[in-house]
Amino acid sequence: MDYLITAFNRITHWFLTPTNLEYIGSYSLPPGLLRVNDVAVANHKATLDRSFDKYLYEHEINLITKEYRRSPIDEDSILEDFFSGDLPYFEIPFDEHVERGLECMAAAFRPPRPCRPAHILDVKHGYPYKWNVNAEPPFSTDEYFLSQRKTFGEFIRMHEYEHIDKEDFFRRHPNIESHDFLRTVVPPKFGFLKSMIFSWTRRWHHIIKSGFQDSTDLEQTGYFFNRFIFPMLLHTKTAIVKKNDPNKMRTIWGASKPWIIAETMFYWEYLAWIKHNPGATPMLWGYETFTGGWFRLNHELFCGLIQRSFLTLDWSRFDKRAYFPLLRRILYTVKTFLTFEEGYVPTHAAPTHPQWSQENIDRLERLWLWTLENLFEAPIILPDGRMYRRHFAGIPSGLFITQLLDSWYNYTMLATILSALHFDPLHCIIKVQGDDSILRLTTLIPVDQHTNFMDHIVRLADTYFNSIVNVKKSEVRNSLNGCEVLSYRNHNGLPHRDEITMLAQFYHTKARDPTPEITMAQAIGFAYASCANHNRVLWVLEDVYNYYRDLGYRPNRAGLTLTFGDSPDLTMPEMPLDHFPTKSEIRRYHTETHYQNEAQNARTWPRTLFINAPGE
């Protein structure tokens, strides 16, 4: 009954005082809640308890095991987090400072030449997507597409597995010659439905590019009526919190694959240019901790004899408080980073496009505008099946360009605030990645003025953007030592992190089914995450690894994904799993002045496909 009353009140409230989220109906197949194997989690904790008893003090064990917890994945917590984005309308004042912020963002992120789109077939065969993810609506929800799925036998026989991770596939399915397995229908994952998804997406993109004039006999379908804008499923990842703190989670909005693929076409070259040229933009891609990121960042931000202040800001509910009017201005500015007039990115198979015409330009323009239509119109499906549409705020977290979009928005806010404080943003050094940031100002702010300075920033963030600065996690410092970005603090160019919090993350694992193989790989991952700064932490982690090794288990690389995430934007050094790493292996790249992972670069921008480097 409470649920019905809450839902009814939310619907009727919207008509009285329109807020950001509007209920628009229910979906036939809502996303289910992911279940946790409580027995496996208990076994995981028991193994770590055994190692903790050997090497940690009692108060440390109590802090890790009793004072921290992982937020549960339950419907009430998910709905509470989602509806925290039901904000009142806010009008951003586009005065000279916001305009200056947009100008500085454009100058800071502009590539040396406009980037060209990639052809959809080049995206299909060349982009390194995460394949073991949900196919998303309509492919994962609508009966027609679900009924078209192949069996594993057909999938293997037709050689449709070339793109997937073979090691992961055989680990998940060890009995591939079993008749039962070969007759089993593949799950609705992107990798298993790749051919179907790209085939339909190409057809739908053709209709969109024609301005919905060439319907290819689909004009009577609901997909055509909805302009191929499909709803997003709400996926959830939990976080570690103190035992008495409110639940915290990260929601991932499953954007449709036709939308993801279109964004890949438009932004692949631009994204690859940023990754291949760390430091060319404010993006912190290429400054990953384990590759010597803080060492290089320390060099770039160091002031020498001229003292200056440094600023790190933490935003509360950053994505939810991003307003559409500024997002539109940002995206129309970013469009000047692209060109549709030169054809697609030259490949060895198609080095030129001599027949390129204004009609081709217009077709790409329509598809690009359709990606914006998705951004501002696509509804979201909650676990209980209710569908909501955002009216004026919120950046979906599952887009191809989510981290870029967050970074552009974050930089624009920071540059606006600096301008309002009478700084020239382009004379400051601003580094961003999503909602994370570190700034070097052009002057030294006396220590006794730090609180006053932060108060000004808080006020301006609220005045200009209705954004909330988390003052407890934001800092003004007069030394680069001790500054924190990307979860690590700087100690003269070397990264440091609180070891107890890190062990709490390992203990309260995010793995839903932490097998011994997963836990072994996580132990290696956390060893690298520790940066070899804490001997006792390494002893604990190695003890866990050796315990399972002596029982005959071998690490499963999926455990590294749980530790570091699986974003294609993440550059990581190779981490062997056949042994526990030594200190020298962990620290191998910590003092690299110029880190390049050629294998990663080749995946990001395969020169076997493209003629030129990105941005050339």
Swiss-Prot record:
Enzyme class: transferase
Annotated protein name in UniProt: RNA-directed RNA polymerase
TM ranges: none
Pfam families: RdRP_1
UniProt function note: RNA-dependent RNA polymerase which replicates the viral genome.
Coiled-coil residue spans: none
SUPFAM superfamilies in alphabetical order: DNA/RNA polymerases
Molecular-function annotations in GO: nucleotide binding; RNA binding; RNA-directed RNA polymerase activity
EC number: 2.7.7.48
One annotated GO biological process: DNA-templated transcription
InterPro entries (alphabetical): DNA/RNA_pol_sf, RNA-dir_pol_C
